[in-house]
Design a protein with these regions (language model features):
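Fe(II)/2-oxoglutarate oxygenase catalytic core
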Residues: 1-122, 126-192
Length: 192
């Protein structure tokens, strides 16, 4: 969370891990399945995508300028888009972050700035990233895949499919396509 912020407006739709570690549909997905399906269809219908983007979950955010972090429980391959009447709020992303160093040691010169308001942005959520400060109202969607999604019950996975989710199959098809678009991180040592 940003400094001096006590809460953020953020929810996850799709799959999540329960407190005991099982993979389940979030309560908001069960309650608002048509809304979830609409967000899934939005991504599926994007003309910029060459292939259906594989994911299990969507993080929905309002006015959240995330500090530099690496996502936990995210297999990495992520797609994001932001909306609203705001200025700033780009995604800063370190494509060569290998997750080994401390976040405070990252150099701004090694990052990319992605305009998620103008375009969808593909990034690896397990690598360092943050949202730059903004003015106005900013909404964002982050499509990602949770670890262990394949252990979800069949009826849960079937429910996702009925909501237009293209489930990831790690060694084939779209998952391989998008993973290969993200070059392997070089790490901090490669920059020395």
């Amino acid at each position: 969370m940003p400094e001096n912020v006590t809460h953020v407006c953020s929810d996850t739709l799709g799959l999540t891990r329960s407190r005991v570690g099982t993979v389940v549909l979030t309560k908001h997905t069960r309650k608002y399945s048509q809304y979830f399906a609409l967000l899934c269809k939005f991504l599926k219908d994007c003309p910029e995508l060459c292939q259906d983007f594989p994911f299990t979950s969507i993080s929905t955010n309002f006015d959240y300028a995330a500090r530099t972090h690496r996502d936990s429980n995210n297999k990495g391959v992520s797609m994001t888009k932001s909306f609203g009447a705001f200025i700033g709020g780009q995604l800063r992303y370190w494509p060569d972050d290998d997750g080994e160093g401390e976040l405070r040691a990252l150099r701004k010169a090694d990052s990319l700035t992605l305009d998620t308001k103008a375009n969808l942005a593909l990034f690896d959520g397990a690598r360092a990233h943050c949202v730059l400060p903004f003015l106005g109202e900013r909404y964002s969607l982050v499509y990602f895949t949770i670890e262990g999604h394949e252990r979800a019950p069949k009826e849960t996975l079937d429910k996702l499919r009925t909501c237009h989710v293209s489930l990831p199959v790690p060694a084939s098809g779209a998952w391989k396509y998008y993973t290969q678009m993200l070059s392997p991180p070089k790490g901090a040592r490669a920059k020395s």
